[in-house]
């Protein structure tokens, strides 16, 4: 996975011409100019983590990814535009006080773990049909949860899925261990969540669902 950059916008815009993808993601169609503006806005927003998922079988890793986010080296990005298969996002917010579990109330409030009452909405899209039903969405989502647990100290993950999107519902429930916490009848939309308590490791959170070898991996820039 790599940060969402301007070079990715045209392909992303092509994806979002699909009525099915617009409906599944709850998105509105944008012009190409608006898509570029949205990319810049999301990149500058500290409450959003947005990454493009690359399929390993189509990815030319080259010598290094260390300069992936540098203006001096765009070669990796341009070389792998055809490996783009989808995107994964985290939208960060603070939990409402009534939504914080008893276990989370016991969290320390020091600066080091001030995010322990934060939550993240998870949004995953595998846009290319050739990349679907291969487990890439599960792996990308697991990787983002592992990163957010280890580095952002997120206490609650949740997602909202249309009731007729059975593959996504099965992935979050059966493959990732999310549980249903709400249903909005007016939107015909389920909400699922995965909570952690103080001290939970990612292994405890995801159990056997932790993936040791990913088809897609995170750019080192995630940790910068």
Task: Show the residue positions of the predicted features.
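Acyl-donor (CoA/ACP) binding surface of acyl/acetyltransferases
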Residues: 2-4, 8, 15, 61, ...
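Helix-loop element at the rim of GNAT/NAT acetyltransferase active sites that forms part
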Residues: 3-29
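Charged/polar, solvent-exposed surface patches and flexible loops
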Residues: 14, 23, 37, 41, ...
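Amphipathic alpha-helical interaction segments
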Residues: 20-23, 50, 200, 222
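Soluble sensory domains of the PAS superfamily and closely related sensory modules
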Residues: 44-45
């Amino acid at each position: 996975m790599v940060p969402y950059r301007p070079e990715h916008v045209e392909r992303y815009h092509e994806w979002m011409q699909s009525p099915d993808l617009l409906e599944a993601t709850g998105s509105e169609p944008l012009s190409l100019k608006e898509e570029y503006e949205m990319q810049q806005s999301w990149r500058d927003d500290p409450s959003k983590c947005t990454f493009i998922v690359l399929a390993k079988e189509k990815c030319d890793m080259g010598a290094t990814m260390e300069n992936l986010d540098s203006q001096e080296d765009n070669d990796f990005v341009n070389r792998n535009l055809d490996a783009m298969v989808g995107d994964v996002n985290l939208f960060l917010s603070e939990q409402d006080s009534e939504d914080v579990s008893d276990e989370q109330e016991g969290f320390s409030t020091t600066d080091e773990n001030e995010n322990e009452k934060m939550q993240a909405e998870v949004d995953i899209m595998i846009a290319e049909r050739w990349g679907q039903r291969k487990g890439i969405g599960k792996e990308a989502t697991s990787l983002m949860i592992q990163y957010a647990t280890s580095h952002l100290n997120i206490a609650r993950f949740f997602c909202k899925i249309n009731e007729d999107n059975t593959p996504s519902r099965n992935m979050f429930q059966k493959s990732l261990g999310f549980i249903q916490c709400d249903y909005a009848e007016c939107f015909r939309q389920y909400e699922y969540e995965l909570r952690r308590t103080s001290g939970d490791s990612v292994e405890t959170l995801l159990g056997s669902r932790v993936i040791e070898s990913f088809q897609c991996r995170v750019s080192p820039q995630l940790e910068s």
